[in-house]
Amino acid sequence: MHLGLDGKVIFVAGASRGIGLGIVEACLAEGAKVAITARGAEALEAERARLAEAYGADRLWALAGDMRDTQVIEDAVTRCEAEFGPLFGAVANVGLYPCPPGFEVDDETWDAGFTQNLDSAWRLSRAALRRMTPRGDGSILLISSIAGLGALGTALTYGTAKAAMNHLTKELARIAGSKNVRVNCIAPGNIIFPGGTWEANSTGPRADNWARWIRREVPLNRYGSPEEIGAAAAFLLSPKASFMTGAVVPVDGGQTR
């Protein structure tokens, strides 16, 4: 299916590895021009160079910066538009933050978990909406988690912030819909990639236990891949999903009940 992303400008926060990188590659494969951002300059530049070889340097723009910071986000989106033209799509993929199990979570860790997961998504969405709504066109995608769809025993800050992201998606969709700007969300399940949590689980001392758990809990009996999230993301961002907004889409191999 041709998704109609040729020449569209997509901004992806958290793009140097894993899910974010999978989304970038899917959008590039559909002909989009993609701005990629992440905090780690070295990893970001390595991926920019690799992707430029495959898709052309003229369709990539990279900026290392903290996508939790309002001014950094605003400046990055402004520079993206100066480089490529009007923003069509924005992907908020900044997430995770270390949090101990249980309820003994100090205020600093609690606040940091929400800043990392929820606030980063809100601030990028706001920056994108400021540009998209006057033009009457655009598509925003938040990357949440199935941890936000139910109590799965994840760290309190993570699951709670992701649940708030799911709600944010629906509220922003109602606000922006009359301006022809769509806001959707993907809730990934157990996605495996180099350096990620599930790679550590699948290769660590409890790898056999985790393998049994996956077979028991996931009807497709396996982990997902960044490419599979990328495929769903490219569709949701694209004009082909023109009647989808406010949707929280699990991509989890059937794990959520």
Tell me what each language-model feature is.
Residues 9, 16-18:
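Conserved glycine-rich cofactor-binding loop
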Residues 101-114, 210, 214:
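Substrate-binding pocket helix/loop in short-chain dehydrogenase/reductase
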Residues 125, 161:
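Active-site helix of classical SDR
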Residues 130, 174-175, 242:
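Alpha-helical segment proximal to the catalytic Tyr-Lys
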Residues 145:
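Residue(s) in the substrate-gating loop at a strand-loop-helix junction
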Residues 177, 182, 244-246:
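Short, small/polar-rich loop/turn modules that mediate ligand/substrate recognition or access, typified
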Residues 222-251, 256:
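C-terminal substrate-recognition "lid" of short-chain dehydrogenase/reductases
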